[in-house]
């Protein structure tokens, strides 16, 4: 039958076809009516049903014989049709034998019914009425199937985020980017660039989908829809849903069109014409799948098809060059490399790590919902070194997101209950021993009236517990009572916990009532661990006889006023909430905490010294050393530092959230210009203080701009100085620092950098705040992108943003450092020299009672401006002098 005679309701398929066992000779010359024996799996022959049960039953059950595989299927009687049966056959083959699929299988299979009473046992089915209950239906491949059909097996490609360095299986180049770097085939697992999607051959092996042929499908009526027509290509849409199962997602990309595939297959294959080639991007040999190492002349490239390989592999490559394939009149093979300098450690990328480490499917990002376009309407990207055309109305940039660095931003599993059980106690105020059902979680110890009710006698926050000690005070014990087992000491009361009955053996009956030394010791151990959850359990003192508690761990405490105290345990001063992860930096994880005596909320960065070599310990203390010398309202305040042999604890003030969270939670995932001006001015004022002291932050990004409150116009403070450097006004540094998405080109290229590095980051912050996307695409050179205004500032959303904002961004995102704006020049830019912004800042300074952003010398100028333009000039602003005047004069 013709390929164009498929039912209108069924989309044209590129499903895997009948397995090799379906027909012993699956070739165009095979007989269209050759079937295998109708023997059942139990050895007996099937007998056709003499009556059709559709009149009395709502479903029809029959057997499908596909080669040596037999499946029992059930179809609703009212839905039984020849088209439905063929759909079901395609689905079974697609699931059990995906590597045997071919183009247009639906139109090239024949169905035969086994009739044992007929001389010709196999009877061709031309109508669904010929299928009866219990029949055996043989699936046979038609002679219309050609060799080309078997060789065309399109890939099923999905946008994928890779966690390890991965290379394109078409061009051999690395897949660049932070997320959604490329496309992965669900069938064979190969990886491709998005730009290579329309060039790759339709040769999917389907090895990842293969199901054992002797394993039945989950249900007899399972029906899997056939793939979409190969003439249509699915592209990402801006509106979509996430967290779809890989098997349920709609394929987002396809390979080259079928007509091109057939044209290529007709070409004569000739030997490759190899020439020595220098690669500017990390590339692998497409024969042995290993990295082409070296600075230049790393390997050989075919002049015609651009196949890349080692010199040693050139003689082993099959002679299958097809020349340069054109698509819509344009070259479809890989073009010349674009010059994007990037340093890659060859030791970190090998044949094992370059692929296979990223097979875990991640939830599809929101852009993966599909709509369909005819490929003739699509412009194929050129790989030549040129500026690519960008959509004039929308941005192709990566959406703004939280960038995670070396330490995974993971939250400790929050256990609602650490320990629970009956326990007895009395207090320093009441010597009557009471029995309650204790429940210990990560933040408090609650004494319930019973084990099932919600009423409780007392709640003891862990942050109020000053220390746990062995039994020392027996003055309050009742006469004739047994002594307690340990003491919980708070600022207002002492809890004497447990009852030591003198029996060292374990008594389950007494333990269930809260009496006994062993049950009390288990509670003491659990509470000690809850008080210091980030300390390894092996390091925590658990024996009641130990009086030093945690003091053997903590060796010193360094306070911001330079006082040093020996043997001070951080758990006696602060309570760390392990399930309250505020964020993670390069060197540690930040937890929420509370000062035990005052109840003040703090943020505690816990740095694991064991993660870093001894020679880097000085770098770990760099943040503390810098913060100790910084006292500015726009910079997070350091309270103190604790150090143990294993960890460093940096205690800082706790703020409400960060700027990135504010951006992402906004209505359009971007900020209005008014709020952006307000926050950027504060960032620049804090940077001015840093640069005046020759301190460069080196890792400025929205995650490191903290907000003091949830107000629409909040106070902002800079944090995370782990990368900060002391750099003089005319000095340069070369060490690699910071987060790549916000770093200036000179750092990424390992060139010398100075304090202007922070100004580039400010430009990126302004860009992402106003647009909600990163300014640069990972696949293109920054110079080319900056010069392409259509790429940098697409009408959506930049038509709504003032030209002054764009001008400031352009002056900050200058590749040449000497052309980049300084702090003072940025503060003087017309975009920030705005009367409304000045009013917002003055209102904020009046609210907090401190003037440190604006300067009193500007008051007269703005008063004249208000008078000239008939604007209201408030008189209630505070007039206190700027504190910066006393320590700097920039």
Swiss-Prot record:
Residues 576-832 form the Protein kinase domain. Its EC number is 2.7.11.13. CDD domains: C1_PKD3_rpt1, C1_PKD3_rpt2, PH_PKD, STKc_PKD. GO terms for cellular component: ciliary basal body; cytosol; nucleoplasm; plasma membrane. Ubiquitous. The modification Phosphotyrosine is found at residues 426, 457, 742. Belongs to the protein kinase superfamily. CAMK Ser/Thr protein kinase family. PKD subfamily. Converts transient diacylglycerol (DAG) signals into prolonged physiological effects, downstream of PKC. Involved in resistance to oxidative stress. This is Serine/threonine-protein kinase D3. It comes from Homo sapiens.
